[in-house]
């Protein structure tokens, strides 16, 4: 028997980057978790169905975080005076080594999943660690919480500390075993192949991971062109390749299956061509790029090439889980790039940044991040009445105000694929 859900409230979403759709006191109808109608009135065929009325609250799509490191959750706000490579050595690698203990993983991942829920991140693309058991713990907790995610067991077999490095063949064996075990988590929580980045993966490992991605038909995530030191390092490790991007491409880690690359700040025009050709998604991580002094990604330039773009918190290079704040930071960074670097590329608009935080990143999951017909119903219910303002505001103004000055306390309900997601901690 089909399950029908009807939500009523002030609806806002972005079917395209340039356009907000706002429907005052409108209706969203979903059947078996998929939107079949979104409009001003209830079609006659559904007139007898029960309506969940959220009154004057805002109804927006759930947020999608396209890049975060779950094991780095306890490192938020630490080492923000360092650049990428020293930061990894000082803070990241020692913390990730602790996840050899599944009990420690359960403790930290439980807090991380709770924070995703609290901030309205209904879908995410996550790095775990090299430890397959702990990565399975993360997947289990996400499944139990009712949140959707791609989760990766990290691979790294070179240029890594002795306490956080794998043997090449064992890394591939562990990854295959982890992929097989991941099947138990169902449609909302899925595996993603995760070479940390080129400097930490030998060619043998990268080739093997590419084969596993194709064999299991699972996507790939990694980092690309985040920091000048990293780029120079890759060039010294792979002089046979014309650029950083093509190292991934030549090892069949880009384009064969859906791929998302975090950062992509310092790409050459040739590399941008490759990204467009392979339709590799960019995860733009504005807080991290500022905190680690990495640079400002040329987002408008990438948009003009029709490269898919989502937003990432990049915990813990980024220090804030809230995608509402990540998207406003993306707008702010684009303004700085426009003012200080290149006035040929206009700053991001609110609708463009909101699109990236919802439908833009949601495309990696399929039809997600919008209330258009055929999309999974992921939604947040926002009660903004406690934000003082005696003036009458449009729905778009109310949304903008909440994104900038509101917080998770205003999110009163969360839906994933048509189901209410209760507080994981009860």
Regions found by a protein language model. Give the residues of each.
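His/Asp/Glu-enriched, well-ordered alpha-helical/loop segment
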Residues: 250-256, 300-388
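C-terminal cap of metal-dependent C-N hydrolases
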Residues: 16, 376-426
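Active-site gating loops and adjacent loop-to-helix segments of metal-dependent hydrolytic enzymes
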Residues: 74-105, 153, 158-168, 227-256, ...
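Metal-coordinating catalytic core of metallo-dependent amide/deamination hydrolases
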Residues: 133-264
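Alpha-helical scaffold segments that flank or form the walls of functional sites
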Residues: 76-147, 171-185
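N-terminal metal-binding scaffold of metallo-dependent hydrolase/deaminase domains
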Residues: 1-46, 57
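Divalent metal-coordination and catalytic microenvironments
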Residues: 10, 28, 33, 56, ...
